């Protein structure tokens, strides 16, 4: 299911905050997000279950939790405004929902950067079937 969602996004073109999130990750980590994070571990990409495999996968778990806490927002499609100031992401705009989505994406991009040294290639295309069915709580 996760793979189909990612392929659909790639075929249709990325819109809204997904494109902005991709740009944040690329700038913070130097990695191409679709290749490096779209299928990483048990939580990166669409959906997630089980225990995060490592610190990078935990970044995705926390990001999913952040999105879950947003009410009345469409975090994958609502575009937001942000800028870079002295190497830091600054979320802007007047819409509180869009600003919160930006803050979730910002936190994840920073988390990916901070955990680059623990990134494991073996989790890049980790099969969902190997993730346990019982998920951690946010």
Curated annotation (Swiss-Prot):
Chloroplast among keywords: no
Substrates-to-products reaction catalysed: a 1,2-diacyl-sn-glycero-3-phosphocholine + H2O = a 1-acyl-sn-glycero-3-phosphocholine + a fatty acid + H(+)
Molecular-function annotations in GO: calcium ion binding; calcium-dependent phospholipase A2 activity; phospholipid binding; toxin activity
Active site positions, chain numbering: 63, 105
Keywords from the named record: Blood coagulation cascade inhibiting toxin, Calcium, Disulfide bond, Hemostasis impairing toxin, Hydrolase, Lipid degradation, Lipid metabolism, Metal-binding, Secreted, Signal, Toxin
Disulphide bond pairs: 42-131, 44-60, 59-111, 65-138, 66-104, 73-97, 91-102
An annotated GO BP: phospholipid metabolic process
Record GO cellular component, one term: extracellular region
Cofactor note: Binds 1 Ca(2+) ion.
Binding site for Ca(2+): 43, 45, 47, 64
A UniProt-annotated Pfam family: Phospholip_A2_1
Entry comment describing in which tissues the protein is expressed: Expressed by the venom gland.
EC number(s) per entry: 3.1.1.4
UniProt keyword Protein biosynthesis present: no
Signal peptide: 1-16
Family: Belongs to the phospholipase A2 family. Group II subfamily. D49 sub-subfamily.
Biological role stated in the UniProt entry: Snake venom phospholipase A2 (PLA2) that shows potent hemolytic activity, and exhibits medium anticoagulant effects by binding to factor Xa (F10) and inhibiting the prothrombinase activity (IC(50) is 90 nM). It is one of the few phospholipases A2 capable of hydrolyzing the phospholipids of E.coli membranes in the presence of a bactericidal/permeability-increasing protein (BPI) of neutrophils. PLA2 catalyzes the calcium-dependent hydrolysis of the 2-acyl groups in 3-sn-phosphoglycerides.
Protein's UniProt name: Basic phospholipase A2 B
Phylogenetic lineage: Eukaryota, Metazoa, Chordata, Craniata, Vertebrata
